[in-house]
Regions:
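Extreme N-terminal tail/first-helix region
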Residues: 1-18
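ATP/adenylate-binding site constellation spanning eukaryotic-like Ser/Thr protein kinases
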Residues: 10, 22, 65, 135
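Short connector loops at helix/strand junctions that flank enzyme active sites
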Residues: 20, 35, 42-44, 61-65, ...
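A short local loop/turn or secondary-structure capping micro-motif enriched for an aromatic residue
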Residues: 43-44, 56-59, 99
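Helix-adjacent hinge/juxtasegments
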Residues: 49-79
């Protein structure tokens, strides 16, 4: 068996991000790095995330640099992974007309994943915070095996 690894192209990275809905967000917290799974939607140069008020949000406001990883694993040597590095922004509809427009766009984008988000029937009503991550750097890898 021959195992090969290669970098994914920018288009392949975007395709994997578009095909996934759960990623792992890594961020600095009390002299360590924490990582948490969460739902996201990719849209252009941005990832839109939804969370609740708490420790993660408090830390992200003070240390906005994050990484988000998504992957598609079919076997030990049959997988693809994308890592996005960027800065996170808290979206607040009270930040004037531009803030309201960013919030409305984020909610509409997130509703592609969860149609009832921020509406009657919302499956996670306690998650009232919308964030977006600017995809400053995106890279991906793929492993594959062949019987050569």
């Amino acid at each position: 068996m021959s195992i090969s690894f290669r970098a994914l192209s920018a288009d392949e990275c975007q395709a994997l991000l578009a095909s996934q809905q759960v990623g792992r967000l890594a961020y600095a917290y009390k002299q360590r790095v924490d990582i948490e799974p969460l739902h996201f939607v990719a849209d252009g140069e941005w990832l839109y995330l939804r969370t609740a008020h708490g420790t993660k949000l408090a830390m992200l406001v003070h240390q906005p640099w994050v990484a988000l990883e998504v992957d598609e694993v079919h076997g030990l040597f049959d997988w693809r992974s994308v890592v996005v590095h960027g800065s996170v922004q808290l979206l607040d509809p009270a930040d004037g007309p531009d803030g309201q427009a960013r919030w409305d766009h984020a909610v509409a984008t997130f509703r592609r994943l969860v149609p009832a988000a921020f509406a009657v029937g919302d499956p996670t009503p306690a998650r009232t915070v919308m964030l977006r991550v600017h995809m400053s750097h995106v890279e991906g890898r793929q492993a594959s095996a062949s019987d050569a």
